[in-house]
């Protein structure tokens, strides 16, 4: 704030009493106006420089040049001219190096000349401690991570002012944050250098702060504040805050994607997009929804299964090839102690003198006895027309055997012709009185009856010792059950199944002479060829 003082020209002798009063009471003395007020004197203190300026009241009188005089009131001295302010054309003068004592009162006189004539003369008195306000210094503010630094600058050519006096003038740094104002009073000790730094901390992030620096004089009404300098305080720099910005961007993108997907799915559900079931692949989010919300696996289908055990009775066959009757003569099965059942097989031999018709009738009669129900027997067995002897019934396995292992029958006793017999069909010697059948060596025991009645039973397959004992016990019983084929035809019984083998008897009668030859065809079977002589 500038101080203006109206001065008038007075004599040096009249100033001494006023100087004494000014020093005692410490007040500024205003020199009484002893002449007409032709100009106004002003003292300024800018950047530690004392500038005295003047302004003319009567603008019609314009001096061409000025000269400045001064004296100290406490010293009985005459007026002295200021060397740098003689015959100057400007309306101010720098008294920084002239007025150095701040406790003295200085009396100044400005004289204006036009050519060599004095046209204006003005006087004034100033007490530097109170009448010279200080202009605010230059400063800068810098923001850091958590504070603000205020850098106050002083000129190198500053006046020679002691540090104690500078502490008196350097007052406050004001901090403006919104509507609040906070003053900081720095503590200065020692000599003052070019710059002075002051740190302001405990700041609120993302807040705009304004700083002002000024010197406070004794009169509060004369404070001259500097212009405000503002800065936005950020606790972190932009480089450090890049990571939160990235995370925020990712979250925003994720939310936008979720909103878009949910919108499309809702439009699909309500049928707004399209009304067909085969959607394009771009709009098919079923798999994506399964990944986010997995569905429970479907329940297993269960059905009740009822197991029904069917008990089937074994069909017993009584093969009877009698000419007089086609009815099966059932023979009561004999149950052995081992739980097996004996079955007899009635075999019929074709007559000696046979013709093609008689042989055909014989084969048809055999088929009628068997009901021709065996699916494996595709063609009926037709005996060769040159056979002269009746073929005796050959023993075969019982009906409990699933495989067709019967001697001359297929599965249920039907005779079948071995390929080997077809090869020998051209020879009259091998085709007469011969029957071809298979024997399972794993389950059949064969006893061949030769001319000697004392021949022993020959076992064709091994059997355990227990089964051999049972075989010997039932030997007599088996021999009694064997029947010899006669003209009417007899029944050839099977052996006991508990023996796990069959013992066929090949002796048909005393008049029949048999010769046997066996051929192994693999799979545990043997082809037996029996040569039969013609019966009388």
Swiss-Prot record:
| Keyword Transferase part of the UniProt annotation | no
Q: How does it sit in the membrane?
A: Single-pass type I membrane protein
Tissue expression profile of the protein: Expressed in the endometrium. Expressed in all tissues examined except conceptus at day 15 of pregnancy.
Q: Which InterPro entries match?
A: FN3_dom, FN3_sf, Ig-like_fold, Interferon/interleukin_rcp_dom, Type-II_Cytokine-TF_Rcpt
GO biological process annotation, one example: type I interferon-mediated signaling pathway
Positions of the region 3 X 5 AA tandem repeats of S-L-E-D-C?
358-372
The protein's matches in Gene3D superfamilies, at most eight in alphabetical order, are given as:
Immunoglobulins (2.60.40.10)
- The residues exposed to the Cytoplasmic compartment are 268-536
Q: Transmembrane residues, as ranges?
A: 247-267
Phosphotyrosine is found on 340, 525
- Write one Pfam family the protein is assigned to: Interfer-bind
At what positions is Phosphoserine found? 480
Could you tell me which residues belong to the region Disordered? 369-434, 487-522
Region described as Mediates interaction with STAT2 (and required for the recruitment of USP18): spans on this chain = 432-456
Q: Which keywords belong to this entry?
A: Cell membrane, Disulfide bond, Glycoprotein, Membrane, Phosphoprotein, Receptor, Repeat, Signal, Transmembrane, Transmembrane helix
The name this protein goes by in its record: Interferon alpha/beta receptor 2
What organism is recorded for this protein?
Ovis aries (Sheep)
- Lineage, please? Eukaryota, Metazoa, Chordata, Craniata, Vertebrata
* Gene symbol of the encoding locus: IFNAR2
């Amino acid at each position: 704030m500038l101080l203006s003082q109206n001065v008038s020209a007075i004599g040096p002798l009249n100033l001494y009493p006023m100087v004494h009063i000014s020093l005692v009471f410490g007040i500024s003395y205003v020199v009484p106006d002893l002449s007409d007020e032709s100009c106004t004197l002003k003292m300024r203190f800018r950047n530690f420089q004392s500038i005295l300026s003047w302004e003319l009241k009567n603008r019609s009188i314009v001096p061409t040049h000025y000269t400045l005089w001064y004296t100290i009131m406490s010293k009985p001295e005459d007026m002295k001219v200021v060397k740098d302010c003689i015959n100057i054309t400007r309306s101010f003068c720098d008294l920084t190096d002239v007025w150095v004592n701040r406790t003295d009162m200085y009396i100044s006189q400005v004289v204006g000349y036009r050519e060599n004539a004095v046209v204006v003369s003005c006087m004034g008195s100033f007490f530097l401690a109170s009448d010279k306000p200080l202009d605010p210094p230059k400063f800068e503010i810098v923001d850091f991570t958590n504070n603000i630094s205020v850098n106050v600058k002083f000129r190198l050519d500053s006046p020679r002012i002691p540090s104690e006096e500078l502490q008196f003038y350097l007052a406050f740094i004001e901090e403006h944050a919104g509507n609040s104002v906070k003053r900081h009073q720095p503590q200065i000790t020692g000599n003052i250098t070019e710059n002075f730094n002051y740190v302001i901390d405990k700041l609120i992030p993302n807040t705009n702060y304004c700083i002002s620096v000024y010197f406070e004089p004794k009169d509060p009404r004369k404070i001259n504040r500097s212009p405000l300098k503002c800065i936005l305080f950020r606790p972190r720099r932009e480089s450090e805050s890049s990571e939160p910005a990235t995370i925020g961007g990712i979250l925003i993108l994720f939310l936008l994607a979720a909103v878009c997907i949910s919108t499309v799915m809702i439009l699909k559900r309500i049928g707004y997009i399209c009304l067909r079931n085969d959607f394009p692949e771009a709009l098919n989010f079923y798999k994506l929804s399964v990944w986010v919300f997995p569905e429970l696996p479907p329940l297993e289908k269960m059905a009740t299964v009822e197991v029904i055990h069917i008990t089937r009775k074994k069909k017993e066959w009584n093969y009877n090839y009698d000419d007089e009757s086609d009815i099966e003569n059932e023979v009561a099965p004999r149950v052995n102690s081992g739980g097996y059942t004996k079955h007899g097989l009635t075999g019929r031999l074709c007559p000696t003198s046979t013709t093609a018709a008689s042989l055909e009738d014989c084969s048809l009669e055999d088929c009628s006895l068997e009901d021709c129900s065996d699916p494996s027997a595709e063609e009926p067995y037709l005996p060769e027309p040159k056979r002269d002897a009746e073929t005796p019934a050959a023993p075969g396995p019982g009906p409990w055997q699933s495989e067709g292992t019967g001697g001359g029958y297929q599965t249920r006793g039907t005779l079948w012709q071995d390929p080997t017999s077809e090869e020998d069909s051209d020879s009259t010697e091998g085709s007469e009185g011969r029957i071809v059948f298979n024997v399972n060596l794993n389950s059949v025991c064969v006893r061949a009856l030769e001319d000697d009645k004392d021949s022993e039973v020959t076992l064709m397959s091994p059997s355990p010792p227990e089964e051999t004992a049972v075989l010997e016990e039932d030997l007599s019983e088996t021999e009694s059950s064997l029947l010899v084929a006669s003209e009417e035809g007899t029944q050839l019984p099977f052996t006991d199944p508990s023996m796990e083998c069959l013992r066929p008897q090949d002796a048909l009668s005393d008049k029949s002479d048999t010769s046997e030859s066996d051929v192994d065809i693999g799979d545990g079977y043997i082809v037996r060829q029996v040569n039969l002589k013609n019966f009388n």
